[in-house]
Amino acid sequence: MKGSHPNAGSLLEPLHKLNPFSENSTSGHRKNASDHSADGETRPIAIEMKDSKGNTVPVGNSRPSKASNWLAGLMEDKNQRWRRSMEDTHICLYDFGGNQDDGFVAVYDGHAGIQASDYCQKNLHKVLLEKVRNEPDRLVTDLMDETFVEVNSKIAKATHNDICGCTAAVAFFRYEKNRTRRVLYTANAGDARIVLCRDGKAIRLSYDHKGSDANESRRVTQLGGLMVQNRINGVLAVTRALGDTYLKELVSAHPFTTETRIWNGHDEFFIIACDGLWDVVSDQEAVDFVRNFVSPREAAVRLVEFALKRLSTDNITCIVVNLTRNPGDLDDSGLTADNDSYSNDYY
């Protein structure tokens, strides 16, 4: 993993040095009209896109196949007691880029509207995929950084809104070196978080970019901004995000990135969720909680219910990704692709 945390442990292999402060997309379309076969069996929906050269290329599948060796489960809740609208979006793709068992999972937490998070949900993975295809020899973490910056530059024009923004937590994992090793790449901007379970221990793979963080507060003030009650100019609580064009000189789109080798038998799952969960549940609490469940779907559902009981006041989106899948595991993920934005239609 690029970088380390105090509880990282000896299995965290440093692959590259970590810097914690470190064109026109086209809509994807589904290759198949239905995800059910004639006998009623649920099957993956293949998602494709046009690349910058006009070629049709695979993006991934909306559901796992019987051969998939990982499985994700989702739960989202508007938290209507405190919120009038749902501004979170997410995406989960199996066989990302047409490569068996590669995956892309992301959560986007919008603020001042859903437009920025919706744009990221529909486009960020495609921008990253094209960069990985076109520049296979470059560090993936560098490509993720460039992807965040590029997507950020397009949000205001695409949404006709310079106030909306979103935090982002992105995970891309794949097999490398002729499938002799598996690597998890992550990037986040803002306070959406990614936590890996390794031998039962919580390993945080993200950084909370908040006004309350001394490093981030210092960065903002050095750029001429004011921190008022841990908010940029008294307005925005996160210091890194996508969008927020009206604060573009102060709010950075450059993500915190990590690169972690996945060790079979040690790395069980990771949790990717917005701050609606993490505001009331610690990393280790979440890991301990999820380990009580075999199904990632049930784990995600129960974890969100737990956060609501702890009086979370925000929208909550939580995805639990089991890095190994036992034969016979059902696709009970709660993830669907009933529309081209792959979300908001689960129940």
Curated annotation (Swiss-Prot):
Which terms are listed as keywords in the entry?
Hydrolase, Magnesium, Manganese, Metal-binding, Protein phosphatase, Stress response
Name one molecular function that GO assigns to this entry: metal ion binding
- Biased composition, Basic and acidic residues: where in the chain? 32-41
Which residues hold Mn(2+) 1? D109, G110
Domain (PPM-type phosphatase) ranges: 71-323
Q: Any binding details for the cofactor?
A: Binds 2 magnesium or manganese ions per subunit.
Pfam families found in the cross-reference section: PP2C (PF00481)
Q: Where does Mn(2+) 2 bind?
A: D109, D275, D314
Lineage: superkingdom = Eukaryota
| GO annotation terms (biological process) | cellular response to osmotic stress; negative regulation of MAPK cascade; negative regulation of p38MAPK cascade; signal transduction
Q: Which InterPro entries match?
A: PP2C, PP2C_BS, PPM-type-like_dom_sf, PPM-type_phosphatase-like_dom
Q: Does the keyword Magnesium apply?
A: yes
* Reactions performed catalytically: O-phospho-L-seryl-[protein] + H2O = L-seryl-[protein] + phosphate; O-phospho-L-threonyl-[protein] + H2O = L-threonyl-[protein] + phosphate
Q: What cofactor does its activity depend on?
A: Mg(2+); Mn(2+)
Instruction: Give the region (Disordered) as residue ranges.
Output: 1-41
Q: List cellular component terms (GO).
A: cytoplasm; cytosol; nucleus
Q: CDD domains, per this entry?
A: PP2Cc
Q: What is its EC number?
A: 3.1.3.16
Answer whether the UniProt record assigns the keyword Acetylation to this protein: no
Q: Which family does it belong to?
A: Belongs to the PP2C family.
Subunit architecture: Monomer.
Report the protein's function: Serine and threonine phosphatase. Has a specialized role in the heat shock response. May be responsible for the dephosphorylation of hsp90.
Would you tell me the protein name for this molecule? Protein phosphatase 2C homolog 1
Cite the source lineage. Answer: Eukaryota, Fungi, Dikarya, Ascomycota, Taphrinomycotina
